[in-house]
């Protein structure tokens, strides 16, 4: 169009020159001023008999794929198109490949905001700037029609954006992560549960969503391995089954065994990669044993015992205390100095009865301890604070401590019973009997009993 206007201007100048030559040299200044006015006017189009009015070429939109989500109203429809484009640039569609190939000149001109003058004479640039500005603005208005934009350009709402980016499943995935984490908080001995990054099956964006998860530990009653006893003779060696729950207790407070100590407890042979193989085996059942871990409790001889052997030792100790402890001789020996008179014997008897009551209360408390051992897991009956204290002691001794104390207190109760018997027999004797005669009487009663 601009070249046609330039040709028309040159044609008019040639006609004026010819007319001046044939009209006795009188210049036609009004005609030139009108031509200059048409030439330098920035916006109005030139009306010439030989030039038709400019019309933009027809636009054929490229084929595009219809999206599944619906459109929403443009939130900036009440503003002008120029202001709407400046406020919300996301609502403007990205040009496709076909549009870039079809209109390279228009994109370069609109992107820079200035007309392109490549190939034009340098002298015409000041004269044609106004005409080209008007033409560019007309073309911009023509191509900014709403029907030329993609159907989803004005409706890139939150739902569509979430579906395009693959974020529609993220709330459900984070809920699942939160539920798993809540379950982890309810488990006992959290420190040994396997922890690692969550491997989400529905993660289209490959986001590094990581939280501490509890892959539920395998069946706690499942046997992890069998361990030969340390205290048994070679002729009667017995093996004790170590369950998954027991391994979890040994890795948890208060002991917090490391790989070296746990390998010794489980009687694993020392090797170059023994710690790594043990950690891999524990990882398969859902337990975590970090490398370089430090033990929390002081190592004793009881540390080397598994729970089965420790409980076995406590039972044997209780049997020996019940069957072999000399309760009667000890009671007779300690009661002799207090048989001088009825008042002294009565005071001694009251002391023994009080001690017997204390031992009974103490034994009943220890018998209500519900610390899990082996495959047993009973419901607690004591208050939480006292049960936690008893569990700490029982876990340190692997079940041996409470049962051993009960056996020792039972031996003490047997002594008290025998002492009360001696006092009762001495109290029934005549008061004029001397302590020596009382001793002789006790000896005769002992011989008669045998």
Curated annotation (Swiss-Prot):
Annotated signal sequence range: none
Keywords: Activator, DNA-binding, Isopeptide bond, Nucleus, Phosphoprotein, Transcription, Transcription regulation, Ubl conjugation
Primary localization class, coarse: nucleus
Region (Disordered): 13-63, 90-126, 431-450
Processing and modification events after translation: Sumoylated on Lys-10; which inhibits transcriptional activity.
Description of what induces expression: During retinoic acid-mediated differentiation.
Compositional bias of kind Basic and acidic residues: 440-450
Pfam families (UniProt xref): TF_AP-2 (PF03299)
Entry keyword annotation includes Nucleus: yes
Residues bearing PTM Phosphoserine: 252, 434
Cell compartments where the protein resides: Nucleus
GO molecular function: DNA binding; DNA-binding transcription activator activity, RNA polymerase II-specific; DNA-binding transcription factor activity; DNA-binding transcription factor activity, RNA polymerase II-specific; DNA-binding transcription repressor activity, RNA polymerase II-specific; RNA polymerase II cis-regulatory region sequence-specific DNA binding; RNA polymerase II transcription regulatory region sequence-specific DNA binding; sequence-specific double-stranded DNA binding
Cross-link entry Glycyl lysine isopeptide (Lys-Gly) (interchain with G-Cter in SUMO), positions: 10
Intervals of motif PPxY motif: 59-64
Biased composition annotated in UniProt, kind: Polar residues: 95-110
Coiled-coil residue windows: none
GO cellular component terms attached to this protein's record: chromatin; cytosol; mitochondrion; nucleoplasm; nucleus
Cysteine disulfide partners in this protein: none
Annotated stretches, region: H-S-H (helix-span-helix), dimerization: 293-424
A GO biological process held by the record: morula formation
Keyword Transmembrane: no
Family: Belongs to the AP-2 family.
Domain statement: The PPxY motif mediates interaction with WWOX.
Function, as annotated: Sequence-specific DNA-binding transcription factor that interacts with cellular enhancer elements to regulate transcription of selected genes, and which plays a key role in early embryonic development. AP-2 factors bind to the consensus sequence 5'-GCCNNNGGC-3' and activate genes involved in a large spectrum of important biological functions. TFAP2C plays a key role in early embryonic development by regulating both inner cell mass (ICM) and trophectoderm differentiation. At the 8-cell stage, during morula development, controls expression of cell-polarity genes.
Record's protein name: Transcription factor AP-2 gamma
Organism: Homo sapiens
């Amino acid at each position: 169009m601009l070249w046609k206007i330039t040709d028309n201007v040159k044609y008019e100048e040639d006609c004026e020159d010819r007319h001046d030559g044939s009209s006795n040299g009188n210049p036609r200044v009004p005609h030139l001023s009108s031509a200059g006015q048409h030439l330098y006017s920035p916006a109005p189009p030139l009306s010439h008999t030989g030039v038709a009015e400019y019309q933009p070429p027809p636009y054929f939109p490229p084929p595009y794929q219809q999206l599944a989500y619906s459109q929403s109203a443009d939130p900036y429809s009440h503003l002008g198109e120029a202001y709407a484009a400046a406020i919300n640039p996301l609502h403007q569609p990205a040009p496709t490949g076909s549009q870039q190939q079809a209109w390279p000149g228009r994109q370069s001109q609109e992107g820079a905001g200035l007309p392109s003058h490549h190939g034009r004479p340098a002298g015409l640039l000041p004269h044609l700037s106004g005409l080209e500005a008007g033409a560019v603005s007309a073309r911009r208005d023509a191509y900014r029609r709403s029907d030329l934009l993609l159907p989803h350009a004005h409706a890139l709402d939150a739902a569509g954006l979430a579906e395009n980016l693959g974020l529609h499943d993220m709330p459900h995935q984070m809920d699942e992560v939160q539920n798993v984490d809540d379950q982890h908080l309810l488990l006992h001995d959290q420190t040994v549960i396997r922890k690692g990054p969550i491997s989400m099956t529905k993660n289209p964006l490959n986001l590094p969503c990581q939280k501490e998860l509890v892959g539920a530990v395998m069946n706690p009653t499942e046997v992890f391995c069998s361990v030969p006893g340390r205290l048994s003779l070679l002729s009667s060696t017995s093996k004790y089954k170590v369950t998954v729950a027991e391994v979890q207790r040994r890795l948890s407070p208060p002991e917090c065994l490391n790989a070296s100590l746990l390998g010794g407890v489980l009687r694993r042979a020392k090797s170059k990669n023994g710690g790594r193989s043990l950690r891999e085996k524990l990882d398969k059942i859902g337990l975590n044993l970090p490398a370089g871990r430090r033990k929390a409790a002081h190592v004793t001889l009881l540390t080397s015992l598994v729970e089965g052997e420790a409980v076995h030792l406590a039972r044997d100790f209780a049997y020996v205390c019940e069957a072999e402890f000399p309760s009667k001789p000890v009671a007779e020996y300690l009661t002799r100095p207090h048989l001088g008179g009825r008042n002294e014997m009565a005071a001694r008897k009251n002391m023994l009865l009080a001690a017997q009551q204390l031992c009974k209360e103490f034994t009943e408390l220890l018998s209500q301890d519900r610390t899990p051992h082996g495959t047993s897991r009973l419901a607690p009956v004591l208050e939480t604070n006292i049960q936690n204290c008893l569990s700490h002691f029982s876990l340190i001794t692997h079940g041996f401590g409470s049962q051993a104390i009960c056996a020792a207190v039972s031996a003490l109760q047997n002594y008290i019973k025998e002492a009360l018997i001696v006092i009762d027999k001495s109290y029934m004797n005549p008061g004029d009997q001397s302590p020596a005669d009382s001793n002789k009487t006790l000896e005769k009663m002992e011989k008669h009993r045998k």
